[in-house]
Each structure stands twice: as C-alpha cells, then as structure tokens.
Amino acid sequence: MNTKYNKEFLLYLAGFVDGDGSIIAQIKPNQSYKFKHQLSLTFQVTQKTQRRWFLDKLVDEIGVGYVRDRGSVSDYILSEIKPLHNFLTQLQPFLKLKQKQANLVLKIIEQLPSAKESPDKFLEVCTWVDQIAALNDSKTRKTTSETVRAVLDSLSEKKKSSP
C-alpha cells in the first residue's frame, strides 16, 4: 500500500506527533533470528482513552495500523515495515522535534535487507537504534548495540572453535 497523504494532513499530524508521538526503534532478543535479535520499528501516538476516537480516526486516515488501550491511555501503533516507510517518508519533511528519529528509522528500513545477511551491517544498524533511543530519552532499555556485539562475538567464537 503506497498511500499518498495530503499536505494539510501531514502538516497537522507532524505537529501533533512532535508533541504526543513517538518514533521508536528497539532491539529485542529473539533466539529464532539469525543474529539472536530482532529489530522493532514503531510509529506511535498516545492519547487519553477518552480521546481514543481521534486515534481510531488516524487508523482510517492513514489506512494501516491499530489502536491499543493501556489503562487510562490509548496508542495508535504503526509497525508494518512497508507502510511505515511510506508514511514516514511523507511525514518526515514536516517534523521538527522528531525529524532525526524519522530519518534514522528510514535509514534502518532501507538497510534491513543487507542487515539480515551481514553481522557487521546488523551491528551498524543496531548503533542507529542506540541513536534513536538517545534522542527519545529512553529510560528502560535493556538491549543495546553492545549487547548485540557481545552475542555476535560469542557466535563468531563458537564458529571458530567448531571443527
């Protein structure tokens, strides 16, 4: 789906996202993946649940994503890679506070195919995730590019010691 959004909508949404939105990249441990980690990329807008109607309207207007409730707040979530790339490509020029995060997420998405094949490229992409976390003032992060580096080094050592 390559929806083209109108400029007025993108301008409004960029201001809204700069205030109440998040552009998130995470490294999650996952033993079933080649490098024992997966990357998670998310565009999120949070509102009090009493204003969930606004988030439901975003789902309709953006055409992808979903709304989840977390107690007194609700979140609009977009994490499907192709629609996320399409959406952020159009939104990015209008962002002010979150433009660096959008640029880094777009860069990550564009490098995903090679990052899935090369441990060095995967590690490089993980450093971009670290940069996004720093821009977002992330407080609860457990897995960083250094965590991934240690796992990749361990995997490399196992390969070397195997006959």
UniProtKB/Swiss-Prot annotation:
Cofactor binding, per record: Binds 3 Mg(2+) ions per homodimer. The enzyme can also utilize Mn(2+) or Co(2+), but has lower cleavage activity with Ni(2+) or Zn(2+). Ca(2+) Co(2+) give no enzyme activity.
Result after altering residue 142 to G: Reduced affinity for DNA. No effect on catalytic activity. Reduced cleavage
Outcome of substituting residue 47 to N: Strongly reduced affinity for DNA. No effect on catalytic activity
Interaction with DNA: annotated span: 26-38, 44-47, 68-70, 138-143
UniProt-listed GO biological process terms: intron homing
Effect of residue 33 to C/H/R: Alters the specificity of the endonuclease
EC annotation from Swiss-Prot or TrEMBL: 3.1.-.-
Domain of life: Eukaryota
Organism: Chlamydomonas reinhardtii
Record-level GO cellular component terms: chloroplast
Magnesium is among the record's keywords: yes
Gene3D superfamilies in alphabetical order: Homing endonucleases
Record's protein name: DNA endonuclease I-CreI
Keywords carried by this UniProt record: Chloroplast, Endonuclease, Hydrolase, Intron homing, Magnesium, Metal-binding, Nuclease, Plastid
CC cofactor: Mg(2+); Mn(2+); Co(2+); Ni(2+)
Residue numbers binding Mg(2+) 1: 19-20
GO MF term set: endonuclease activity; identical protein binding; metal ion binding
Lineage: Eukaryota, Viridiplantae, Chlorophyta, core chlorophytes, Chlorophyceae
